[in-house]
UniProtKB/Swiss-Prot annotation:
The keyword Phosphoprotein does not apply. The gene is SPTSSB. The lineage of its organism: Eukaryota, Metazoa, Chordata, Craniata, Vertebrata. This is Serine palmitoyltransferase small subunit B. InterPro entries: Ser_palmitoyltrfase_ssu-like. Residues 1-11, 58-76 are cytoplasmic. Component of the serine palmitoyltransferase multisubunit enzyme (SPT) that catalyzes the initial and rate-limiting step in sphingolipid biosynthesis by condensing L-serine and activated acyl-CoA (most commonly palmitoyl-CoA) to form long-chain bases. The SPT complex is composed of SPTLC1, SPTLC2 or SPTLC3 and SPTSSA or SPTSSB. Within this complex, the heterodimer consisting of SPTLC1 and SPTLC2/SPTLC3 forms the catalytic core. Within the SPT complex, SPTSSB stimulates the catalytic activity and plays a role in substrate specificity. It is found in: Endoplasmic reticulum membrane. Residues 30-36 are lumenal. Pathway: Lipid metabolism; sphingolipid metabolism. The keyword Lyase does not apply. Its main location: endoplasmic reticulum. It is a multi-pass membrane protein. Belongs to the SPTSS family. SPTSSB subfamily.
C-alpha cells in the first residue's frame, strides 16, 4: 500500500510539472528538447553551486572574522 501511494505521489508530481511547464501541450520531440535544456541548466546550476559556494563561505568567514577580531590558530 505504501509503495502504491509513493508511485501515485510521483505521478502527481510529474503531472504537476507537465501542467506548470506547459509540457502537456508540446509534441514529443519538443518535450524532449525542453526537458534536455532544463536538465542541462539545472545541472550547471548545481555544479556551479557545488564549486563556488564553499569559496564564498570561506571568504565571508575570513571577512567577518577580521571585523569581529576572531583569530584562529589554525589559519596562516
Amino acid at each position: 500500500m505504501d509503495l502504491r501511494r509513493v508511485k501515485e505521489y510521483f505521478s502527481w508530481l510529474y503531472y504537476q510539472y507537465q501542467i506548470i511547464s506547459c509540457c502537456a501541450v508540446l509534441e514529443p520531440w519538443e518535450r524532449s528538447m525542453f526537458n534536455t535544456i532544463l536538465l542541462t541548466i539545472i545541472a550547471m546550476v548545481v555544479y556551479t553551486a557545488y564549486v563556488f559556494i564553499p569559496i564564498h563561505i570561506r571568504l565571508a568567514w575570513e571577512f567577518f572574522s577580521k571585523i569581529c577580531g576572531y583569530h584562529s590558530t589554525i589559519s596562516n
